[in-house]
């Protein structure tokens, strides 16, 4: 398949083990191919009746799935992981067409997706409570039980991966899930739904509804939904939390960030430069945990900046389906204009553009309407600048200088966000001392933007709460029942 040829020809809702058209609507949306600007799908947003049918189907499937043993669920999840692994290139291609990231990166995403399913398949058979001995031979025990129908609401930067990150632990615990992808990227999650069905989950266990804010509201407020997990912006996350609170539903929120990356003068320069590029330019900079505030110790500021600019200018921009492309288009034109607007404001506030920050027009005529820009490196930045304070969500790196460890820690933590942070240094004592003080949920030492499924991922402060990945996520998709067993006579106060 090549850029500019794909068109969606099947329904984009999934319910009861099959693709379906929604029975009612809350509007229509268009999905684009960012590389070419073409419309690849016009689809109906699910209305309240469709959402209710999806939830009821999930509720029925939950009754079957929750009664299966952990090992039975394990085998089915492993089969789903195997299918994803076999269809890796197909799924990655679909992800690239609808999202715009390079096929090189998309394959990484699909690999972490099947690894996520394998990881939670391994945990499915090991979930257990504990036994507590009480006086007189009595005892108590706990049971870890599923919640019921969970809702996953995904973001457009990692459509397939996020669906796996949310559904794998949910299903491993015995839950069902209704998933709503971003209306910008509605396509690839349907492949996951079909794969789950092929692997053997009960029909209705993983359903997909399409739509925007109205559809999300129907899901969050549905009386039979037990939990909501959301990935996206802080303002939307706040609304999700408010709507869910009315039904006393637990939520997991993975929201935005403006993360610090601290480069000390004793760093390995080559690795620090590579880390800074990884922290800013993956998926065209459209990554919530990106380390976009790059603090560089003054002794190496000029050397570091020169090398970063040199490497940034070498990034191959263009058709994301070509093997040598390393940066594709941004998600859509409004977002491209928004990111370019941040660069304009940065210059007005005194920042200096060392490279990029402007529109890129590929030579291929079929890409002329795509949403491309050159990756941007800003210097002469101050902590009070808009480009340093607000999440840009594009390929824009802001470089700031610092003198001392104490100073940079205070500045790094001076943000309402707390998703991620990183430090590059050869001093292992300093590395651990610094990350202990950083107010962020995911910290990197001498690397950045790696997300092994074994490690919990989530934020502090306004970047959200709850965790995805790692063993601890089981606690966010299950509930604990305590059973007290009396082996003697009842001691009554009456």
Curated annotation (Swiss-Prot):
Keywords: Acetylation, Cytoplasm, NAD, Oxidoreductase. InterPro entries: Ald_DH/histidinol_DH, Ald_DH_C, Ald_DH_CS_CYS, Ald_DH_CS_GLU, Ald_DH_N, Aldehyde_DH_dom. Pfam families: Aldedh. The keyword Cell cycle does not apply. The active site is at 254 (proton acceptor), 288 (nucleophile). NAD(+) binds at residues 180, 232-236, 391. The modification N-acetylserine is found at residue 2. Its EC number is 1.2.1.47, 1.2.1.3, 1.2.1.46, 1.2.1.19. It is an enzyme of class 1 (oxidoreductase). The modification N6-succinyllysine is found at residues 30, 59. PANTHER family: ALDEHYDE DEHYDROGENASE-RELATED (PTHR11699). Homotetramer. Converts gamma-trimethylaminobutyraldehyde into gamma-butyrobetaine with high efficiency (in vitro). Can catalyze the irreversible oxidation of a broad range of aldehydes to the corresponding acids in an NAD-dependent reaction, but with low efficiency. Catalyzes the oxidation of aldehydes arising from biogenic amines and polyamines. This is 4-trimethylaminobutyraldehyde dehydrogenase. The lineage of its organism: Eukaryota, Metazoa, Chordata, Craniata, Vertebrata. The gene is ALDH9A1.
